[in-house]
Amino acid sequence: MRQYNVTGMSCAACSARVEKAVGKVPGVTSCSVSLLTNSMGVEGDVPPEQIIAAVEQAGYGASEKGAGEKKPSGADATALEDKETPVLKRRLIASVGFLLVLMYFSMGHMMWGWPLPAWFEDNHIAMGLVQLLLAGIVMVINQKFFISGFKSLWHRSPNMDTLVAMGSMASFLWSVYVLFAMTRAQVDGNMEAVMDYMMDFYFESAAMILTLITVGKMLEARSKGKTTDALKGLMNMAPKTAVLVKGEKEVTVPIEQVEKGDIFVVRPGESIPVDGKILEGHSAVNEAALTGESIPVDKEEGDLVSAATINQSGFIRCEATRVGEDTTLSQIIRMVSDAAATKAPIAKIADKVSGVFVPVVILIAVVTTIVWLLAGQNVGYALARGISVLVISCPCALGLATPVAIMVGNGMGAKNGILFKTAVSLEEAGRVQIVALDKTGTITSGEPRVTDLVCEPGYDEKTLLELAGALEKKSEHPLAKAVLLEIAQRKIATKEVEDFQALAGNGLTGILEGHRLLGGSMKYISGQVTVGKQVKNQAQILAKQGKTPLLFAKDDVLIGMIAVADVIKEDSPKAVQELQNMGIRVVMLTGDNEQTAKAIGAQAGVDQVIAGVLPDGKEAVIRKLKEYGKVAMVGDGINDAPALTRADIGIAIGAGADVAIDAADVVLMKSRLSDVPAAVRLSRATLRNIHENLFWAFFYNIIGIPLAAGVWIPIFGWTLNPMFGALAMSLSSFCVVSNALRLNLFKVKDSHRDHKIKNEVTLPQWEASKGEKNMTKTMTIKGMMCGHCEARVKKTLEELEHVSEAQVSHEKGTAVVCMETEVADEVLKKAVEDQGYQVENIQ
């Protein structure tokens, strides 16, 4: 999508006109115009020159945003600066100054008996001329209304400025006519007519309309400026300089000059300038700027750091990995600003109304004037009713109702580490009825941890870990990392084993100080040493809880068992409970067997567990779930991308794969499941705010226009002076924007006001097919020449833990592996390659 800056827009009718004009350009597939940010997003294979020409032909200005330019993360902050308010403030001060003098002459003497210079006594012509001059000056000060309004009218796309310009100009021209008529009457000596004409002056209305609308515009501009505070805050976080290492020297350079691969240093208290990898040193880094999490994260050599985060302690030397618009901060800024440039589906209602609103209002004003003339009223009275209709009508309130709430909602999300990529995702997240959670990395941490230690008599936990660690230290198995992490946390020293062997599909063996050590699965160890019934029962209990028991022996005698599992995150049960309290059904998807899956599901408290789902089968499950309601998919892996795309709302955990993040509609920077209900909560609050804004905008116009037209005069005697109509118009947009700003006070983590949705869904019990109960992987193997090779590979694979069957063909060079639960590709590959064959691919 190409982004453009658009100038000259003043209300929703303007944005609708630009959108319509660009949408007609051949090759444009979609166009979205944001009145709030004066920007436009265009999709389609069309040269920028054609787009700009279409906008200019519609009576506005456009320029392409600098795509692909190398610039710092905060370079666009100036584009969001409130340049409108200072200009409007100067116009308002000047307008009020002349308006007060005008009001003194037009109403002060007549209504309150305020003194006038002697030469004005009974000099009605002079009074009229002074009012004409003062009103003219106010009109010149506010000439932008007339230039924009009549220019839009000329291009057959009238806007709010057209209504204001027509109302003010009509008042002024009528008053000029009355002044000439009064002059004629005074020449004729008809003083009674002169006094009547004095009452028909509307010079003060012409000036007052412009001044009051300027008041409203200034308040609106100031409030609109506040809606982008979150985005401007993100942009201003970007450091302006970096300290690069050039040979033996340290050189401070502008951030724009930092290249990928440069070496930079960061001292305590300084901001990290670009994304990088720590080469030397360690520190605690405050990542609140990106994640909203105030607790510093410990970083050491090899860890990644992000731009705009704060180095709180320690000197670090880093290599730049992402610079300019590729940094994490820049991507966040781009997501938030792109979301503001898109339109929510609910905005289409206001857009359709705004597109025809101004022409209809002009027609109503003309009809109102004619009807009152036909009813026998004089021209001045009828004109006042028509002018009131023009100046009270406000398309701006309609046009701003949705985008201001979307902008504030997006800003609140960004502050809390929740990034909505589009306005559609912000709106739709609150309507979700089913949330499907990937198990690994979403509900669980994604990294195995030691959960249980069971020691045989004569051995304690420390000794068990010392002996187990000696073996696992040389193993490449994923579960070995969990054991070594536990040893590191307990600060237990381990010794080196000799004659170490990793027996593929079986276990580990080695010699430590003359003693033979064994380690591995129940299947392997029970074939080597005697395993008591009590230990076997304990192993079964642990397996039912979703844990993997690892047994260890010394000199053919069992010494203990270590249970390892991918433990659930601390906040997962609470997050699931909060979603359920909102009336949302929570489903867990996993490739594990049913027993393991149900154990994890019970700990998390999900409504339903769907086990044995292949990586490429998640998309099919989401498609099936969508038959029952609106579905959100939460995942973090590459194999989650199809499911994230298929779901109504795809939510990616921020620590996951880039592919998953690209496929998602919402990105959770903190990688915490509790941010899923927070995202739903924020979406609902934003949607509620939009409904309030739209109600006010429609209600205001439905009540205001009939009142201005004089519909209630025959019944209640209610009438509306054009000046009060202008005041009402100026405040309407301000009220809408102010209401949207209330979202800044919303607490996304507060679950006390959560309520269930009206249309809760009921899910049937999921029956996994035979194909879903057993995971399969297809291995492409090079080097198998005969049936003996087949048998060898088949035996090796079937001896692996959780492998139920292996179908091997030396003709095809493949092995189809059926598993009770997922076995890591590395384990399968190592088992086969240890037998002398080459694994080319695993799918």
Predicted regions mapped to residue ranges:
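Conserved ATP-binding TGD loop and adjacent catalytic N/P-domain core of P-type ATPases
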Residues: 16, 29, 432, 512-514, ...
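Conserved catalytic phosphorylation-site environment of P-type ATPases
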Residues: 290, 349, 384, 397-471, ...
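Conserved cytosolic catalytic loops of P-type ATPases
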Residues: 26-45, 49, 201, 232-326, ...
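Membrane-embedded alpha-helical bundles of multi-pass transporters
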Residues: 111-125, 154, 173, 412, ...
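Transmembrane helix-loop-helix hairpins at the membrane interface
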Residues: 87-241, 352, 453, 717-722, ...
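P-type ATPase nucleotide-binding
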Residues: 450, 454-582, 594, 606-622
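Juxtamembrane coupling segments of multi-pass membrane pumps/enzymes
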Residues: 182, 186, 191-193, 207-268, ...
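Flexible metal-binding regulatory segments at protein termini and peripheral loops
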Residues: 1-126, 224, 249-252, 334-342, ...
